Amino acid sequence: MSDDAKVQAAVKRATLHAQRAMNKLDAETLKELQQLYQQAAADLGQRIAAAGGGDGNVALTQLQDVLAQINDRLRALSAARDALLNNGLENAARFGTLPLTTAGTGVQSKALLSSAAAMRVSEESLRFVHAFVAADGLQLSDRIWRLDRHARDTVTNAIEMAVIQGHGAVQAARELLMRGQSVPGELADKMNAASSAGISKAVSGALTGSGSPMDNAMRLMRTEINRAHGEAYIAGVLDHPHAAGVRFLLSPAHPEPDICDLHATANLYGLGPGVYPDRETCPWPAHPNTLSYVEVVFKDEITDADRAGKETPLEALARLTPEQRKGVLGVKKAEAFEKK
């Protein structure tokens, strides 16, 4: 095996190691993020419980003080989340360049990145992540601001609604009892919802339930950490003198057909299925909340069959299964495609 072949094989092995490290980083980061939000929800519940009166209810007169305490805790949550995100981004970018270094491959070669060059690529990828403007016009800082606003609004609204409705329900119940009438079940439910226990439950659901700020934070965390890794890796491997491009890989956890199936199989440049010659043509990442990767393809890996198999996007679509086309195009467009 030639020296070049040994280096290329080492880069391939190191790429797999980096992907495994990224899988671990993703799992550990999301677990820690979930714990941050769950602990915050528990702390909020304790503060609400402390504000409950002798009857266990939070009085209307205490509402503003409770909200001030809640907002303080949410700000602390935001700071902890941002620190976790920044740490994840830095590690992901480092994992991205590691397969292109002597430290990552265990071999010496002028074709690999120096430590200084690897650090520069990592830093550039981090700047890219922060400056990147998505199709919806938002940058990372905008998404973080939206996360904070969502948490503040959902938690505040849950508390305000419970306290205000509970206050009115208590007054109405007193009037009914004074007239010797029974309290309707609906009114009793509103009174119970205004108890410190009821409010704590509502707050926990608002902060950590389905579609909650925690869910959105986990989505953001995975998306941006994966982006930092991929951008660093692509920039690093395309600097290798023998790189032909990068291959778009389907995630092992790919749940159902979508646009990724097309990107991973189309041979648009005669380099082989899913191989793209540069960053501009590579469609990775195909969508948010994905844990997916690309891998380097070297020039000597390109076969005559790859070159002869160059195809158009329409030809690539035609090769997909009907189910895959539905995932890529949507049901109606896929049906229209079938009729052509």
Describe each region flagged by the PLM.
Residues 1-203, 298-340:
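N-terminal leader/targeting and assembly helices and adjacent pre-domain segments
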Residues 201-308:
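Acidic, glycine-rich two-metal-ion catalytic cores of nucleic acid-processing enzymes
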